[in-house]
Amino acid sequence: MLALKVTVYVVVLFFVALFVFGFLSSDPARTPSRKDLED
């Protein structure tokens, strides 16, 4: 039961990290100032 709970937590955290990373990486791309992304 503990392994199942740990697996669920890992999967949830993995998807949350992917969502946050995708949001942060696509956020500067929408803004006109892309110098910050290149720097």
UniProtKB/Swiss-Prot annotation:
One of the components of the core complex of photosystem II (PSII), required for its stability and/or assembly. PSII is a light-driven water:plastoquinone oxidoreductase that uses light energy to abstract electrons from H(2)O, generating O(2) and a proton gradient subsequently used for ATP formation. It consists of a core antenna complex that captures photons, and an electron transfer chain that converts photonic excitation into a charge separation. PSII is composed of 1 copy each of membrane proteins PsbA, PsbB, PsbC, PsbD, PsbE, PsbF, PsbH, PsbI, PsbJ, PsbK, PsbL, PsbM, PsbT, PsbX, PsbY, PsbZ, Psb30/Ycf12, peripheral proteins PsbO, CyanoQ (PsbQ), PsbU, PsbV and a large number of cofactors. It forms dimeric complexes. InterPro entries: PSII_PsbI, PSII_PsbI_sf. GO terms for cellular component: photosystem II reaction center; plasma membrane-derived thylakoid membrane. It comes from Synechococcus elongatus (strain ATCC 33912 / PCC 7942 / FACHB-805) (Anacystis nidulans R2). This is Photosystem II reaction center protein I. Belongs to the PsbI family. The chain crosses the membrane at residues 6-26. Keywords: Membrane, Photosynthesis, Photosystem II, Reaction center, Thylakoid, Transmembrane, Transmembrane helix. It is a single-pass membrane protein. One of its GO terms (biological process) is photosynthesis. HAMAP family: PSII_PsbI. PANTHER family: PHOTOSYSTEM II REACTION CENTER PROTEIN I.
